[in-house]
Amino acid sequence: MLSSTLRVAVVCVSNVNRSMEAHSILRRKGLSVRSFGTESHVRLPGPRPNRPVVYDFATTYKEMYNDLLRKDRERYTRNGILHILGRNERIKPGPERFQECTDFFDVIFTCEESVYDTVVEDLCSREQQTFQPVHVINMEIQDTLEDATLGAFLICEICQCLQQSDDMEDNLEELLLQMEEKAGKSFLHTVCFY
């Protein structure tokens, strides 16, 4: 493997639900993990489907929580957003954009194809410094509480297998094929370089 501890990133659109659920589970399992979003703003479900509540990425989870509490406590309790923001606040202060991160990872998981495309494009646009490989893996995860949890456990299982692998580079493709069969999901996978 590339390092003694697998360095993992999980990326979704807003760094609120899917990436943070995976962050929570991977952290509890003792893995080195960070989570990110890729959009220009954090968008949460609003009063109507076409009217999201929009926050800047500099807004903390606590500020979002308090704002939604003031706006409509019942709605945001019922749809689970207050629960999600409370969990997130216990993990880190606020959302982060992947494009602003300069840390190196061994594996980056994305939660939808558009996020995968953004991450790969960003990595390819950076000047290569160390030529260290980073595996970018996309797993389609619907942006619901249940699917985020199921996806997070699958990401965790993959990470644990990679952590135990003698040679991640040689074993990753085979592992992804096994996981595709087991989970009934297909993965996109590419290698970029730092």
UniProtKB/Swiss-Prot annotation:
Entry-linked Pfam families: Ssu72 (PF04722)
EC number: 3.1.3.16
Reaction equations catalysed: O-phospho-L-seryl-[protein] + H2O = L-seryl-[protein] + phosphate; O-phospho-L-threonyl-[protein] + H2O = L-threonyl-[protein] + phosphate
GO molecular function: RNA polymerase II CTD heptapeptide repeat phosphatase activity
Subcellular location: Nucleus
InterPro entries (alphabetical): Ptyr_pPase_sf (IPR036196), RNA_pol_II_suA (IPR006811)
Catalytic EC class: hydrolase
Major location category of this protein: nucleus
Tree of life domain: Eukaryota
Listed Gene3D superfamilies: 3.40.50.2300
Entry's Gene Ontology cellular component terms: mRNA cleavage and polyadenylation specificity factor complex
Stored SUPFAM superfamilies: Phosphotyrosine protein phosphatases I (SSF52788)
Alphabetical keyword list: Hydrolase, mRNA processing, Nucleus, Protein phosphatase
Gene Ontology terms: biological process: mRNA processing; termination of RNA polymerase II transcription
Role, per record: Protein phosphatase that catalyzes the dephosphorylation of the C-terminal domain of RNA polymerase II. Plays a role in RNA processing and termination.
Protein family (similarity comment): Belongs to the SSU72 phosphatase family.
PANTHER family per UniProt: RNA POLYMERASE II SUBUNIT A C-TERMINAL DOMAIN PHOSPHATASE
Protein name: RNA polymerase II subunit A C-terminal domain phosphatase SSU72 like protein 1
Origin species: Homo sapiens
